[in-house]
Amino acid sequence: MLWLCRLRSFNALHVLGRRGAGRRFLRQDMPSADQIANNSEILDVPGLRAILGRMYKRLGRNKVLVAMRGHRLAVVDGHEINCSYKRCCPKCQKRQITVNGQKRTQYYHRAVVFQLVGPGFRFLLDFELLEPHDDEGTAALRLIRRVLETYPRCFDILLGDGLYPQARLFKLLRQHGKHALVVLKDERRDLLKDARGLFGPKPQRTFRSGATAYRCWDVEDLDSWDSYHEKVRVVRSVETTTLRERKKDRWIERQQTSEWVWVTTLPAAEVPTATIVCFGHERWRIENEGFNELCNQWHANHYFHHHPTSITALWLMLFIAHALFHCFLRNIKPCLRQSLPVYIWAQLMLVEFLLPLLSSA
């Protein structure tokens, strides 16, 4: 109820659950906000992960989560949940921030999220909170290792941003027969320097999709990654997008150019250059349709209760509610679904709970 109604606090949940539909839903009195917060510290985190696992299997059987161009994609990325100068817990990370010329200790939590990406659906599968002295890569390894042990066939290719060209990650994936496709942007890396030296003046592949023209370079069998002893492939894409802007009473066109470089273990004989570029941009799904949606529309950018178990459990419950909500949207007739913004459907759910409460006032 907390997440499906997009409530901002346990206090709001307590008020909503005291009367009307909230009370009928619970069939008993709603606990106070303090009781809910205390109970969230002892929630069954493995049980919540098991619920997400059953949902993943059901979505697969119902052909909701399907492969993209013959491959199952997953994205892993880090996210900072919130920060504070005053409140902390034993699992908080710390950093020094200069405020008005004075250094202050800031406490914060970061987490790594694992998302499955399909052509028409995305599913947030798991969540790992960083320990006090962890970096994002260490937490990501724990998360990926747990996913591989629990759901060994849920993905073929793992996508990641510029923090994930790490030998330990590539080795783990290759040990399990998986491939990596991650952004390569550190100009100090010998791998990127060597790849740029091999990119010719003319692109090896050009194509167009919508308003964007792609010029691509593809180099295989690079072995200049000292800590990773297998050969890798580097793909570069220079993308020019034509944008239209309205100034005063007329439209003006301008071009915007961006460059992307990816390193991957995928062989060119199995996945062509254009598909690598397409898959590489799917990484943004976890930013645009994951974190942005959860923070801006689901109010996940703050602590409901500052406790590590509570944070993990509530985010896993958020993943469950997120999947249920988007499954509900898929079952609405397209003509009706497209006529209303997504947030309106969330407000309608809240109204379903509020109307009985108002009618009984």
Predicted features, each with a name:
Residues 134-191:
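Domain-level cores of phosphate- or acyl-group-handling catalytic modules
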Residues 208-215, 220-223, 295-361:
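A short, flexible helix-boundary coil/loop motif
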Residues 270-305:
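Short amphipathic alpha-helical "interface-anchor" segments enriched in bulky aromatics
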Residues 96-154:
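Electropositive, glycine- and tryptophan-enriched low-complexity nucleic-acid-binding patches
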Residues 13, 32, 36, 70-84, ...:
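Short, conserved catalytic/metal-binding motifs centered on acidic residues
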Residues 1-31:
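Gly/serine-rich nucleotide phosphate-binding loop at the start of the catalytic core
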Residues 37-119:
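Active-site-proximal, Lys/Arg-enriched surface segment
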Residues 179-283:
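An anionic, glycine-rich sequence signature occurring as long contiguous blocks
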